Amino acid sequence: MKFTKLSLAALIAMGIASNASALENVKVDGQVKLWYQTTDMTSLSTEAASATSKNDGIFKQVGAIGDLVAKLRATGDLTKKAGFGTTIYTATTLGLENNLVSSEAITVGATNETNGITNGDSNLPMWLGEAYMTYKAGKTIVKIGRQELDTPLAFTETWNAAPNTFEAAVVVNQDLPSTTLVGAYVSRGNGAQNTTVAKSFSAYGNVGGAYTPGETGAGAYAAGVVTTLIPMTTAQAWYYDVIDVANAFWLQADVKLPYGLGLGLQYAGANATGDVQNKTLAGVKDKDTDAFAVKLSGSVVGVNLAASYSTVSSGVIPVGNTATGFTKTKLYTATILSDGRIAAQPDVDSWKIEASTKLAGFNLGASYGSYDVKENKDGLRAFDVYGLNKSKNPSEIDLSVGTKVDDINLTAYYIMQNDYAAKTVGTTVESKDRQAFRVVASINF
């Protein structure tokens, strides 16, 4: 259900305006989402007797995380040319950490570090995920403020209980036929590695020695063009300057072929610059990372099929999301857990097959990804959270089923990841295999 009117008190509370009469076409919507995941790791320690270092069994508290997140969004027009948008999030564990989960699904503490609901910030955390103004002149739209972004190397991730967002100025122009031009400056973001989102917003870029984009720095610039001028093809080209982190580019073409076939091509590169290069790369020869990916897709008797391959050269910077410590990537070969943390890492070759269909009211999906991790001899895996090395050849199976029961959207995932992490040097700890079960339930209003 969507509302077209909003009370003055609510408008003031959401920081939209102090005079409701100036607003037109106000729409309010929202969502309540319950996010839960349990993980079972095998061979976490080579010492079988070390019970404290094992999570032996799925659905146990030690390997489970979860959150309940509510979202309230309002958009509207201030004038015929100016508009606004704002989104509030609030999160709680519902006390699940007492017996069902060990931590929350997202970071919602005072910073985008490891603080959160279960370790000190338990007063129903709230944050303003979006607060922006828009202005339209002809075929040009300017959007300034806190907002979601969707570009290949800086984007909002929606897989978790709440998305990360940015403080940015974006200009979009469509004067050219069948072509969209985009220019953006990103000053801050609340993305964080693995946990994706934090309450506070930190400066974008300048990872220094911490290897965590988003904590300090001078921001990032991006420019892109998306066009459908080439028949049956959507082509896009992007350039990024993440100050003191990297210069990067992304080229992609998705082609609709005869007989319902599709062909996708991706080529991207990232060159370490500034603090990353000067402070952390002494003696490193391969400072540039290049990636190439190809995907072939089609449909047979109502089943969507696809096969993809990617190769990432040796280097330093992963070809992934600069907003979340490269947690996710838009490379075709990414799977749920083997994403920016494996598929996009330097000196990794990947392939993936996938299938999806609709059956009796259910959305079914399955995929298998295989990853050949090589030495990266002349590069540096500065952004590697798994401890990848040439002795590891991870693989992953993802199964999903989604449906709607009354007003509740339900999606369940089963994830099996094998041989994904290296033995910790000087210890007996070795995270070899793991399986995970994730459930997401939501109600939109």
Q: Where do the PLM segments sit?
A:
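Outer-membrane pore/translocation modules
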Residues: 96-118, 188, 199-203, 314-316, ...
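Outer-membrane beta-barrel translocator domains and adjoining extracellular loop/strand segments
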Residues: 41-54, 58, 97-103, 153-161, ...
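Detector for outer-membrane/organellar transmembrane beta-barrel domains
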Residues: 228-232, 252-378
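Outer membrane beta-barrel transmembrane domains
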Residues: 196-200, 208, 219-227, 235-238, ...
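Beta-barrel outer-membrane channel/assembly domains of diderm bacteria
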Residues: 2-149, 169-179, 227-228, 254-257, ...
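Transmembrane beta-strand segments that form the barrel wall of outer-membrane beta-barrel proteins
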Residues: 34, 142-156, 181-187, 223, ...
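Internal metal/ion-chelating core segments
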Residues: 172-173, 178-255
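Solvent-exposed loop/turn segments connecting transmembrane beta-strands
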Residues: 156, 160-163, 189, 215-217, ...
